[in-house]
Regions:
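Short, surface-exposed alpha-helical segments at coil->helix boundaries
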Residues: 4, 22, 96, 204-205
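Conserved catalytic-core segment of NTP-binding enzymes
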Residues: 145-149, 156-205
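Residue-level signal for inorganic ion chemistry
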Residues: 10, 47, 68, 140, ...
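Residue-level preference for the first positions of well-ordered beta-strands
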Residues: 41, 137-138, 193
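Short functional linear segments
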Residues: 1-46, 53-64, 71, 107-114
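Glycine- and other small-residue-rich loops at beta-strand/loop junctions that grip anionic moieties
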Residues: 46, 120, 196-198
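ATP-dependent carboxylate-amine ligase catalytic core
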Residues: 29, 34-37, 63-155, 171-174, ...
């Protein structure tokens, strides 16, 4: 498939898939060979400033000589913007190669009776495969929507960051700041540190 055909295929995914559980995403990574293993992942959620925080973290790590992968969404012009390696968008050639490797895993998933990954899951899988192929040490992940049930929460980070929280995506995350904060806080775990931006009183209670 050409680059253009691949992008068209990915854009069509929402038409024939539905939201999956985190277990489905973990199964997907299993078929991919668990590219997330051995990576130092920093997970970022919040309402405002997620993209900026991710960019700062990526730049700081590279300034210290670390190899980095950066996964953000949405893209503005080109799908490659979502998958960044050492400060540079993935090339069209590498994008195509990673797509083919991911599709091979997806076909094996479907043969095993599992559903096709969603649009976001598919791009997340491609990103993690790209970072693994390139031998990236650190990966900065921006949540797509919320946190608790977001596909990016299927991997184990070394740290997480929650930026300021406000009213957003209320049709999915809840009608109040407290409910939305609960969804965002779903990225917090017991085995790693969480860095929290100063929040409204309703969020921190």
């Amino acid at each position: 498939m050409t680059y253009k055909e691949i992008v068209t295929y990915i854009e069509e995914i929402p038409r024939f898939t539905r939201k999956h559980s985190l277990d489905h995403t973990r199964e997907m990574f299993l078929f991919l060979g668990n590219p997330q293993n051995g990576k130092k992942i920093i997970h970022v959620a919040g309402t405002n400033g997620k993209g900026s925080v991710c960019a700062y973290l990526d730049a700081m790590l590279r300034a210290e000589g670390k190899s980095t992968g950066l996964f953000t969404s949405p893209h503005l012009v080109k799908m490659n913007e979502r998958i960044v390696l050492n400060g540079k968008q993935i090339s069209d050639e590498d994008f195509c190669e990673v797509f083919e490797e991911t599709m091979q895993a997806v076909r094996r998933m479907q043969d095993a009776g599992l559903e096709h990954p969603t649009f976001f899951e598919f791009l997340f899988a491609m990103a993690m495969k790209a970072y693994d192929r390139a031998g990236m040490e650190y990966i900065v992940l921006e949540t797509g929507l919320g946190g608790r049930l977001d596909a990016t929460s299927s991997v184990e980070p070394v740290a997480c960051v929650i930026t300021s929280i406000g009213l957003d995506h209320m049709e999915y995350l809840g009608d109040t700041v407290e409910q939305i904060a609960g969804e965002k806080a779903g990225i917090i775990g017991r085995k790693f540190r969480c860095f929290l931006h100063r929040q409204h009183r309703e969020v921190t209670l």
